[in-house]
C-alpha cells in the first residue's frame, strides 16, 4: 500500500471540532425524540468503513441520502439488497450497459462491491429526515465532507473524481487537477441524464486512467456479498 494513512489519522482532529460535535448531537437528539433519520446510526459513516483512505481510487459524490424506508445505508447512490433500484442508479446502469462490454444490469442496487474496490461513494450530507429531502443540509455535514475532499486531494495522487451535476462540481472545485483526474457530467437523475450523462463514458475513462497509472481497474458489475445471495 503506497499510502498507509487512515481516515482516523486525518479526520480525528476534525471530529473534535465544535461544529462536528454539534452535528452529531443534533442528529442524535432528533433520533431520541422519535424522528426517523436515514441511514441508521450504524451506517452513517459506511463510505469510510468500506473504502479506507489509502485505498481510494475513484470518488463519486452524491448529495443527500435516500429518504425512503430501508434505502440509505451510507454509500452514495446505493440501496440495500431487496430494495428497488432508484432512478439515478438505473441510469448509471444504463450508461454502464452502453459502454462496458458484457455489463448486464443487476437486479439490485447494492454497491458495496464498488466501495470494496476503492470507489468512495460519498454523499455530501450524511443524514436526512424520513421523507424530507435536504432536511439536514445545513447541519454541518457539508463542512465535514469539504474537509474529506480536501484531505483526499492533499494526501492522495491520481484519484479519479466523477462529478455529476452542479452541486458535485462546485463541491469538487478545490481538487488539484494536476494531481488528480476530474471528470464532469450532468447528474444521472431522470431530470438531467439526457443532457449529457448518457454518453459521458465516465466508467470507461476512469478505468483507462487507472490502468495507465498502474492501478487495477474497477469491476463495475455490482456483486452481492455471498451471505446476501
Curated annotation (Swiss-Prot):
It catalyses: Hydrolyzes single-stranded DNA or mismatched double-stranded DNA and polynucleotides, releasing free uracil. It is found in: Cytoplasm. It is an enzyme of class 3 (hydrolase). GO terms for molecular function: uracil DNA N-glycosylase activity. Pfam families: UDG (PF03167). PROSITE patterns: U_DNA_GLYCOSYLASE (PS00130). CDD domains: UDG-F1-like (cd10027). The keyword Ribonucleoprotein does not apply. The active site is at 64 (proton acceptor). One of its GO terms (cellular component) is cytoplasm. HAMAP family: UDG (MF_00148). Belongs to the uracil-DNA glycosylase (UDG) superfamily. UNG family. Monomer. This is Uracil-DNA glycosylase. It comes from Escherichia coli O157:H7. The lineage of its organism: Bacteria, Pseudomonadati, Pseudomonadota, Gammaproteobacteria, Enterobacterales.
